[in-house]
Amino acid sequence: MTRLAFARSLLVVAVLATGTNAGAATADPDWPCVQRKVPQLSLGQVWNGPDLPPSAKDWSDDASVSALVEDVAARRLPLGDAQKKIRDFAASLPAEQLAPKMAMVMQGMFDHMDAERSHVISGISRYAHRQLEMAADLRKQASDVDALRAKPDADPDEVERRTDQLNFATRIFTERAQSLTYVCDVPTIIEQRLYQLAKTVSETLAAKK
């Protein structure tokens, strides 16, 4: 297979892969994931406990709660370790502080992780939009190389140079498309982690009743 044929085959596969997913689960043309785009979560999607009091929104003013939220929200911390931190924190509280403090923990986790998730979703849309721009540019490059090769007086060295450039750009495009597949899972991973952490908070409250 010639360099140009290889580049064109890569380009066709990559562009088709991008086009297959783009907007698959939403009307947003910049959304490339098969997962449905939900820019923001609602508290009710992850929390089955009692209604949180208005004071829970002040969670960031409490240093201990804020530090716990920061720790358990980090995906680098294994889920089991994060759940243990929540249980240990609840166990350290006086009985009269358990409900208000854990409500703040829940509100804090929701605010922090929902914001992180929304940030990831925005990044995915920007990334996908750039992919569409790159795909259009690659199609133009391939067309230009075809036109150059069709010229009777085409410089073979120039054809080879332009073809190598197209090959390289197409590989970059394909690698980015493959990376996007993994990134698309991140919003769901964050949502599932938040749900499990919320369940742990609910269990600490139920245990003290």
Segments from the language model and where they lie:
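Bacterial N-terminal signal peptides that target proteins for export
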Residues: M1-L10
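N-terminal Sec/ER secretory leader and immediately downstream segment
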Residues: A24-A99
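Non-transmembrane amphipathic alpha-helical segments
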Residues: V120, Y127, Q131-R149
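Heptad-repeat alpha-helical rod positions in long coiled-coil/spectrin-like domains
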Residues: S118, S125, H129, A136, ...
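Short, charge-rich amphipathic alpha-helices with coiled-coil/heptad character
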Residues: L93-S122
